[in-house]
Amino acid sequence: MHIFLIRHGESMANVGANYEKRIPDHLVSLTENGKAQAYENGKWLADYCKEKNIDLSKARIWRSPYLRTRQTSEEFNRHLGISDIREDITLTEQQFGLFDAVPEEDWKRLYPNEYAEYKRQCSNFGKFYARLPMGESPFDVAIRIHQFMGTIYRDFEKHGVDTLFIFTHGTTLRTFLLRWFHYSPEWYQEERNPKNCWIREIDGNIDLGYINDK
């Protein structure tokens, strides 16, 4: 199975505009720069697939239903030309709960008690397992992403869908890698969050890393 994991392009949240406008996370859109990133990297990826003789006739796009991942996939697909497009709620971003849309440097000031409890969990259990107040931990995201893997295995076995382009979010992308390759929580802690529109390639049981991290 050939899989391309793709983080969304630059969003309003990445430049802090969602906090000012109080935009719900699932409705945060790409910036104009983010749309350009997605368009340019989509062209790059289409050329890459052609150069590597990757057959897209049975390819499928999976994406998080958030607006920014939808927009990213649409810009990429201007070049990929894939008609089979599906969404899955397990591909959504880590839920930040009380801290959603709040800059991390403001967590302690705005929510001192909740922040103290979160830091206690980080100290006692590690950041991978520590759950954000009213939100999720990376561990929680890893559990739900494992459910999605069952879907793509079934599609491969029953319908021969063997090339996937998965448009998702930073934490979700890394937990996918953790589950697919049985990486450790320590690996997750050391693994950098991908930049916008970075593409991670998986060929069967081989992690080829980010192929456009220029």
Enumerate the predicted regions with their spans.
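Acidic, low-complexity terminal tails and accessory targeting/binding regions
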Residues: 1-2, 41-44, 51, 82, ...
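Active-site-proximal alpha-helix that buttresses catalytic centers in soluble enzyme cores
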Residues: 2-83
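Generic beta-sheet signal
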Residues: 3, 59, 160-170
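Active-site glycine-centered loops adjacent to acidic/histidine catalytic or metal-binding residues
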Residues: 8, 89-90, 169
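Short active-site segment of divalent metal-dependent hydrolases/proteases
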Residues: 11, 172-173
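Phosphate-handling substructures
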Residues: 24-28, 77-144, 210-213
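Short beta-strand scaffold positions
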Residues: 63-64, 143, 167-168
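Helix-loop module immediately N-terminal to the HCX5R catalytic loop
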Residues: 146, 150
